[in-house]
């Protein structure tokens, strides 16, 4: 699904990522761990080009999305992102937060189709009868887009037990509730992969479990996930690959049993001795 080849990222001459190579297959649950400042979050943000890579390739479905000539927004539709601090819009209700991206993007596509049809209609005036172009088929309206997005958002909120919070603002929610809303907001776009940047680190300990339970459910459904986290128990239980990054390099990548039970790299052994 995703091939990362010799990925590099520099900030003001400082090399934060140094030749990252890794493959993420469909259905992988890959947990990324490492000390603070090691490049974990930068790696994640480079995967959907929230940070432009300095060098290397990120091949997603055969397309190098690190190439500046590629329309990254087309590919971001298939790659959800969940942030450490939720990043909900405080001036919009919970359900509006979930509906925002699907409605915006589908309405944008609708406007493009209508504009194309106007151009086709105009240019057809100057074409011969046998050379006229057929208009783009339009099968929806803005009202239908909004209606369907609302239905989907309500289904997602019901799934996480927060349907009664649909019309409240994020400021009234607990941290755990905000993060669950952020996760289903990502699901509203029907992504093929979701990137999680330390999704529990800003939560009170009592609220961590409800977020991890939702992530476990997604894993059981086959969602491809790449997760930067300090939750070692979650990594042991749910991941099929665990990646250790230090000083901008991958020092070890292995299944959880091998990664935690028989680490090869001395730096990883040292790190695990301090966190387990």
Predicted regions located by residue number:
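C-terminal boundary and immediately downstream tail of ABC-type ATPase nucleotide-binding domains
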Residues: 253, 257-276
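ABC family nucleotide-binding domain
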Residues: 1-256
């Amino acid at each position: 699904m995703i091939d990362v080849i010799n990925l590099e990222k520099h900030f003001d001459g400082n090399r934060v990522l140094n030749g990252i190579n890794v493959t993420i297959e469909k259905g992988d649950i890959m947990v990324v761990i490492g000390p603070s400042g090691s490049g974990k979050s930068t790696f994640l943000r480079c995967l959907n080009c929230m940070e432009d890579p300095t060098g290397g390739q990120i091949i997603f479905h055969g397309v190098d999305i690190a190439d500046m000539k590629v329309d990254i927004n087309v590919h971001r539709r298939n790659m959800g992102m969940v942030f450490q601090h939720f990043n909900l819009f405080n001036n919009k209700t919970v359900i509006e937060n979930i509906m925002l991206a699907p409605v915006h993007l589908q309405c944008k596509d609708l406007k493009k189709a209508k504009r194309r049809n106007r151009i086709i209609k105009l240019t057809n005036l100057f074409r011969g009868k046998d050379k006229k172009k057929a208009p783009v088929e339009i099968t929806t309206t803005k009202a239908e887009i909004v209606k369907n997005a609302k239905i989907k958002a309500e289904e997602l909120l019901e799934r996480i037990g927060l349907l009664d919070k649909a019309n409240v603002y994020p400021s009234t929610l607990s941290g755990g509730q905000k993060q669950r809303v952020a996760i289903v907001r990502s699901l509203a776009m029907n992504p093929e992969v979701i990137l999680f940047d330390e999704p529990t680190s800003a939560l009170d300990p009592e609220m961590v479990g409800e977020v991890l339970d939702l992530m476990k459910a997604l894993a059981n459904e086959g969602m491809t996930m790449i997760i930067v986290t300090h939750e070692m128990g979650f990594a042991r239980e749910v991941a099929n690959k665990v990646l250790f990054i230090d000083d901008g390099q991958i020092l070890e990548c292995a299944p959880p049993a091998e990664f935690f039970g028989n680490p090869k790299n001395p730096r990883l052994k040292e790190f695990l001795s301090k966190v387990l």
